[in-house]
Every structure is written in structure tokens, then in C-alpha cells.
């Protein structure tokens, strides 16, 4: 496999785009590689400018539960496009999508559509602070909630990939209101409650930005109880896990009803769309009927709303979708672990629905400290081997992988075989 055109394209991009990419992880820096420049995608496959093709386990970082260029979703987008790209005015589609989202999630009375997960979490926190009338926020080590200033403290995703505990340019006056607790640790969490005047808590119930690290059920239930005890608003960030891990996101596994929740990725089916929502008494604080301001020129964009609505309709029609995706994820993770064991390579694997993760680690990963003990050098070698064998994995050990509907058992078995070849070559130093 060659990447000559991608190398040239990347060098050209670096002349006019900061870092050559529009989101840091895409640069392949942590795996010491060159990112393939993508020409197109179809189903489970990506095709690059060098005429290479890959089985894609990134799926645009999660949104594409039906794979690339799904014909039904594509056709609906095209039909909507013919009517106009954006109006800056209400449409019936927005109301329909809101109803579909609300119908899947317990405790969700109203939503507000936005353009990105960052907007959703940022807006939810502003709303929670207004409702609680308290400024301090608790987040958890390794959880990533977008790149708004108050949340870039001990974050996962790119911040973990590049070894940054926070970000330059974030004033201390912003970060001083952010208290950081250990994931899956109630004692650490209650200590944070005691330190500050905590108005809200935000958490990924199925963390996907320090690798895949699900919350323990007793921890999440205990966190809900602590929020009630200290009168803080509980925000579940389900931008990644919502409609991915299951139709009801984390609620399928934990049954926890938050005060506010954020969704993204799948609800936009690959176009820019996210939302936040929750109890009516909180949501009604939003302008224009309340005093909490939030706005967006392209919020509720008809193309994104149409794409998301098409995806949700397909999801709801397919009664066995999540069962099939989960089975493929289990087949993959068990296969990877079995192959690693054949070469005495320490590998921990797990999945939640169509989300999966693996760590080159001897022990189970329960929090950010555990994740940071993983062998990132081994991951980089494995990633490069798999890429050149036609398997497109997330280019950081601190990201989650995704199964899509067009994938088959035969594809998964092929990937496991390629993993076996890769481990063999790594051990032999080839």
C-alpha cells in the first residue's frame, strides 16, 4: 500500500490549514503516521486518493450507524436540499425530530437543537448553572465534553492524545469553577462537592474519549444520589453513546434519569447536529421565554435535521439492529483478544452495543489513570500495521471504535485475521 498522494495532499494542507487538519486527532500524530486523504465512503468502506480502500471502524467518529452514503438517507437529504439549504426560521421537520428523540429517552420533556456536541454541553452547563444558581461544575478525569473553556481540564480525546492536561488560552477565572473527580470513584466525587458550591455535574455515562470506559452501575446510581443530596443538576453527555450503545443510550444499561442530557453524532447521521434537553422546568429557562440566552444561525438546519430524522426512522424500523451490531462488536473484541493472547500480548477489550475499545494493558481499565498506563507505542505499531492491511482504526488509543450496519461477520473475521498477522509481524520485528 502506498500513500504518495496523501503525503502530498497533507503537505499542501499544512501550508494553508493550521496543522493541516481541522480537528487535531486527524493528523495521525500520536501514531507517527500520515493520514490517508479520503476520496469517498460507501457502506463499511473508505476509499482514499491513492486508490486504497479500508474497512472503516471510525465511521466519522460515530455518527454513521448505517455506514457511509446510505441510499435512503442520501436520497432524503437530496430531496430536502432541493427545497433550500437553510431558512433561519422554524420548520416542521425540527418538531418531528424533537418528538422522535424525546420518545426514546426517559425524563426528556423538551430539547433544543444545536450544531455540535460542544455547543450542546456548553449550553446545558449554562442552563444548569442558571437553574441551580450555583457556579461550580464537577467533571471527570478523561471525559471529553467538547472544547469550551470550562471543560478543557483533564479532558480525554485529543487532550489525552497530545498529553495536554488542559489547553493554553483558558483563563484561570474559567477553570477555577471546574472541579475534577476520578471516574468511577464516588469518594473523589463527594470530596469535590464538599470543596465548592456545585451547581452541576457532567459525565459521559459510557466514556468514549479515554478509550471506551463505561461507568460502573453502582457509581452512576451513587452519582445521581449525590446530585440530589447537594441539589446539583446532573447532565449526562450522551453525544457519543446516545442512539449508539442502544436506542435509549446509557439508560439501557443503567436506568439513570438525568436532569439534562446531550445528544449528537447519530442524531445528525454525519451532518452537523446535536441537541440538549431535559425536564421542562429547566428547559423553560431558555430564551425566548426565559433568561438563559442560547442561539445559532444554523441550528435546526433542514439538511442535518432531515439526515438525523431519516437515521432515527431507520433505527426504529429495524427491531434487531442493536442486537446485530452488539454481536459483531463482541465477535471483534473477542477475536482481537484471542489473537493477542496467542502472542502473549496484553490486551483488554470491551464493548457497549456498537461501541468498542481495546487497550494494550494487562489490567481492566476503569478510569483515566488506568487508561494512561496503556502501551501507546504498541498501539502505534498495531495501528500502522492494520492501516496498511486495509483496516481503518481510530488513530489514538484514547478513542472509541464503531460498528456500522453494513458490516458482516465475514468482514469481522477478516479483520481479526489481519490483527493476527499484525501481532505476528510486531513480535518478529518485521
Curated annotation (Swiss-Prot):
Cell compartment(s), UniProt: Cytoplasm
Leader peptide range in chain numbering: none
Keyword Cytoplasm: yes
GO BP: any one term: protoporphyrinogen IX biosynthetic process
Top-level taxonomic group: Bacteria
Cofactor(s) annotated in UniProt: pyridoxal 5'-phosphate
EC number(s) recorded for this UniProt protein: 5.4.3.8
Listed InterPro entries: 4pyrrol_synth_GluAld_NH2Trfase, Aminotrans_3, Aminotrans_3_PPA_site, PyrdxlP-dep_Trfase, PyrdxlP-dep_Trfase_major, PyrdxlP-dep_Trfase_small
Class of enzymatic activity (EC top level): isomerase
Coiled coil: none
Tagged with keyword Cytoplasm: yes
Metabolic or biological pathway: Porphyrin-containing compound metabolism; protoporphyrin-IX biosynthesis; 5-aminolevulinate from L-glutamyl-tRNA(Glu): step 2/2
One Pfam family from the record: Aminotran_3
Modified sites of kind N6-(pyridoxal phosphate)lysine: 265
GO terms, molecular function: glutamate-1-semialdehyde 2,1-aminomutase activity; pyridoxal phosphate binding; transaminase activity
A cellular component term, taken from the record's GO annotations: cytoplasm
NCBIfam families (alphabetical): hemL, PRK00062.1
Subunit structure: Homodimer.
PANTHER family, alphabetized: GLUTAMATE-1-SEMIALDEHYDE 2,1-AMINOMUTASE, GLUTAMATE-1-SEMIALDEHYDE 2,1-AMINOMUTASE 1, CHLOROPLASTIC-RELATED
UniProt-recorded name of the protein: Glutamate-1-semialdehyde 2,1-aminomutase
Annotated organism of origin: Helicobacter pylori (strain P12)
Gene name for this UniProt entry: hemL
